[in-house]
C-alpha cells in the first residue's frame, strides 16, 4: 500500500511540474511580447521618395532656386541648442528668446553641429544641376553670423550656387518663411517641420520633408507625411 501511495504521489508531482512548465511557456511575456506578420507588414501610407527619384523628376528642367531649412534638415544642431538651454534657461525654453543665445548659436556653436548625409546628397545634386541654393531658418537674426560660411564649407557649395543664410525669425501666428520663398522665387523647399511644408504649400511650390532625428532636442517629433507631402527615405541622419 505504501508503494502504491508513493507511486501516486510521484505521478501527481510529475503532472504538476509538467503543467507549470507548460504554463510558463504558453503565458504571454510583457518583457518579450513578440510580433506577427501582420504587424511587421503594417506601414503608414506615406509618399516615400529617394534623392535619386527627386533628381530624376527634375530631368530636363532648367536651373532653379531651391531652399533648405537648417536645424534638423541639413544640420543636426541639437548640441548647440542643448548647451543653450543648460546655459540660459535649464528649466524652460526661454533661452530661445534670449539674444545672447542666438549670438552664440549663429557665431560659432554650429561647429558642434553634425552635417546630415541626406543634405550632402541633395546639395551635391542641386549643385550639379546648377541650381541656386538658399537656406531659410527660423533662427533669430544677429548682427554677425558664421552660419553661411559653415554651411558652404561643410557641404562644399561653390560661391556661384551659394546665397547668404536668410534668418526669418519666429513670430507667433505667422509663417515667416513664406515671404522669403516667394521673394527668391524658390521652386522646392526642404524641411523637417510642419511649418516648412505648409510654407511651401502656401507658395504653391514643392515641399519635401526630411526626417528629424529621434534624438533631436526639438520635441515633439512631427508626423512626417501628414500633409501628403513627399518624405525622403533614410533622411533622419
Swiss-Prot record:
UniProt keyword terms in alphabetical order: Hydrolase, Magnesium, Metal-binding, Periplasm, Signal
Short name of any one Pfam family annotated for the protein: Acid_phosphat_B
Official protein name in the record: Class B acid phosphatase
Gene name, Swiss-Prot/TrEMBL: aphA
Gene3D superfamilies on file: HAD superfamily/HAD-like
Cofactor(s) required for function per UniProt: Mg(2+)
E.C. designation(s): 3.1.3.2
Note accompanying the cofactor annotation: Binds 1 Mg(2+) ion per subunit.
NCBIfam families given in the database record: AphA
Function statement: Dephosphorylates several organic phosphate monoesters including monophosphate nucleotides (NMPs), coenzyme A (CoA), nicotinamide adenine dinucleotide phosphate (NADP), flavin mononucleotide (FMN) and phosphorylated 5-6 carbon sugars in vitro. Also has a phosphotransferase activity catalyzing the transfer of low-energy phosphate groups from organic phosphate monoesters to free hydroxyl groups of various organic compounds.
Subunit and interaction comment: Homotetramer.
Any single Gene Ontology cellular-component annotation: outer membrane-bounded periplasmic space
Reactions this protein catalyses: a phosphate monoester + H2O = an alcohol + phosphate
Main location: periplasm
First-tier enzyme category under EC: hydrolase
Subcellular localization: Periplasm
Residues reported in the UniProt entry to bind Mg(2+): 69, 71, 192
Binding site for substrate: 137-138, 177
Any one GO MF annotation of this record: acid phosphatase activity
Amino acid at each position: 500500500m505504501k508503494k502504491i501511495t508513493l507511486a501516486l504521489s510521484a505521478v501527481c508531482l510529475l503532472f504538476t511540474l509538467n503543467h507549470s512548465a507548460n504554463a510558463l511557456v504558453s503565458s504571454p511575456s510583457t518583457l518579450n511580447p513578440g510580433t506577427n506578420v501582420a504587424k511587421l507588414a503594417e506601414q503608414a501610407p506615406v509618399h516615400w521618395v529617394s534623392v535619386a527619384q527627386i533628381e530624376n523628376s527634375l530631368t530636363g528642367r532648367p536651373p532653379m532656386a531651391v531652399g533648405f531649412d537648417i536645424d534638423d534638415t541639413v544640420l543636426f544642431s541639437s548640441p548647440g541648442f542643448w548647451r543653450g538651454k543648460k546655459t540660459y534657461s535649464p528649466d524652460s525654453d526661454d533661452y530661445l528668446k534670449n539674444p545672447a543665445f542666438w549670438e552664440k548659436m549663429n557665431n560659432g556653436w554650429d561647429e558642434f553641429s553634425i552635417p546630415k548625409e541626406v543634405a550632402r546628397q541633395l546639395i551635391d545634386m542641386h549643385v550639379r544641376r546648377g541650381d541656386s541654393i538658399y537656406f531659410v531658418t527660423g533662427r533669430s537674426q544677429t548682427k554677425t553670423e558664421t552660419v553661411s560660411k559653415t554651411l558652404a564649407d561643410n557641404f562644399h557649395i561653390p560661391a556661384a550656387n551659394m546665397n547668404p543664410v536668410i534668418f526669418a525669425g519666429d513670430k507667433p501666428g505667422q509663417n515667416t518663411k513664406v515671404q522669403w520663398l516667394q521673394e527668391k522665387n524658390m521652386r522646392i523647399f526642404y524641411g523637417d517641420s510642419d511649418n516648412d511644408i505648409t510654407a511651401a504649400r502656401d507658395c504653391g511650390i514643392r515641399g519635401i520633408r526630411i526626417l528629424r532625428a529621434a534624438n533631436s532636442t526639438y520635441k515633439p517629433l512631427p508626423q512626417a507625411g501628414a500633409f501628403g507631402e513627399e518624405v525622403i527615405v533614410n533622411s533622419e541622419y
